[in-house]
Amino acid sequence: MNINKIKKNNFFKEKKILKIHLIGIAGSGMSGIALILFNLGYKISGSDLLENFMTKKLKNMGINIYFQHSEENIKYADFIIISSAIPSDNPEIKAAKKKNIPILLRAEMLQIFMQFKFGIAVSGTHGKTTTTSMIFDILNQNKLDPTVINGGLIKSINSHAKLGFSKYFIAEADESDGSFLCLNPTTAIITNIEPDHIDNYNGEFKLLKKTFLDFLNKIPSYGIAILCTDNKAILNILPKIKCKVITYGFNKSAEFRITSYKQSDFISNFTLIRKKQLNNLEIILNLPGEHNALNATAAIAFATYQKIPDEKIYQSLKNFKGTSRRFEYVGKLFIKKKSIQNKSVMLINDYGHHPTELSETIKTIRKSWPKKNLIMIFQPHRYTRTRNLYFDFIKILSQVDSLLILNVYSANESFISGADSFSLYSDIKKIKKNVILVTNRNLILNYLLPHLNGNDIILIQGAGDIDTIINKIFILKNKKVII
């Protein structure tokens, strides 16, 4: 089968005789594609250097996964799907080219799925994973049986992906390398646009904005774009968008406007004014933070557009279980320290790795728990991001009470002098005293204990492998975390 036939193939209906190999199968998007294809009946294999929750799940389902890259792995493949993170000199890619085995990008495979469905693509610099999860939960809990492939684990199904049998296909659309231009959705949600992954856009923010505009202008005339008009970059491209647009935000001009926002602990509530609806909507959301109110409003706008009853929207968001590593409450850390008796601290795990995301998380914690001592354990993600947003990081990271900085998670990038953790540590140290460079993560407790006073929140922050600290250093027992 050549690549053009593959791209026209209806994988939901055709005979399931193809053997498909995924290089980089451990990634959230790639593992989701593997799960969907396997559940459709195709013979799936994959390779990666990393073993994680999803690879274990896929192996238990019966998918053959190799934890090394070798040309032997692709011997029987009819075609190959690759993650954009896989370099061109990968031995499996080189072997596939030599044997003329068709190679598809992850986003190209998403489009193959999407072309036979009502495609819903969620993109933006921040919030797309949570928004995708919310849209899925609203549809799924109301028996609309969507298919979803998300960038994070949806807690209600304990998976990144699920095969449904309705017309709806929801996908998180990755803007980081422009590959979302492969998609042709019926509906697109853009949460925000900020300078990130800017090296993939020749260092030009205007090129990133233009790429988002090009993506939105692929929506057909009968489709719709749902956009957050609190974001300046979205406002900038808004007049050039050709399809129907629904706007949302705190902005007074938004069609779906958030008012009367309040939060307490892990719950937020707000009133949603819908200018084209007869009634306002009172929302209780099982997540704190104004940014999550925005994510929920994007999902509400879509659900309203799909004529889902208000009560069902309300109940879905009230019962929303969240997404793994997105402001995720892990448990309590009970302190064994002579100066502190019978005290425990909260442990929160968050994937945010951009200064704006860090700022929103800090603001959310300060609003719900203003008197808590906030300790952040932060792992910078990518040298290029650290370099490009260096002074923003210094400003935001200086706002926590105590900061522990791990080494940069490189994501296969080369070292950049002045964009490393020591540089961040040195410059933040000029502003605040309570900052520590963690050179040995196995000794994290030794670094952490002096900063605890018994009234603390420990925030584990970053997109790399920082979450393994929870599993390797803290012991989970009876839903509580103990030293």
Curated annotation (Swiss-Prot):
InterPro entries assigned to the protein according to its UniProt record, in alphabetical order = Mur-like_cat_sf, Mur_ligase_C, Mur_ligase_C_dom_sf, Mur_ligase_cen, Mur_ligase_N, MurCDEF_pg_biosynth, UDP-N-AcMur_Ala_ligase_MurC
Keyword Chloroplast in the entry? The reply is no
Q: Name one GO biological process term.
A: cell division
Tell me the Pfam families matching this sequence.
Answer: Mur_ligase, Mur_ligase_C, Mur_ligase_M
State the pathway, as annotated in the record. Answer: Cell wall biogenesis; peptidoglycan biosynthesis
Q: What is this enzyme's catalytic activity, as reactions?
A: UDP-N-acetyl-alpha-D-muramate + L-alanine + ATP = UDP-N-acetyl-alpha-D-muramoyl-L-alanine + ADP + phosphate + H(+)
Q: Where in the cell is it found?
A: Cytoplasm
Specify where it is mainly localized. cytoplasm
- Cellular-component GO terms for this entry: cytoplasm
Question: Which keywords does UniProt give here?
Answer: ATP-binding, Cell cycle, Cell division, Cell shape, Cell wall biogenesis/degradation, Cytoplasm, Ligase, Nucleotide-binding, Peptidoglycan synthesis
Query: Which residues are noted in the entry as ATP-binding?
Result: G124, T125, H126, G127, K128, T129, T130
The UniProt GO MF terms for this protein read: ATP binding; UDP-N-acetylmuramate-L-alanine ligase activity
Q: What is its EC number?
A: 6.3.2.8
Role summary: Cell wall formation.
Belongs to which family?
A: Belongs to the MurCDEF family.
What is the designated name of this protein? UDP-N-acetylmuramate--L-alanine ligase
Species whose genome carries this gene: Buchnera aphidicola subsp. Schizaphis graminum (strain Sg)
| Gene name of this polypeptide | murC
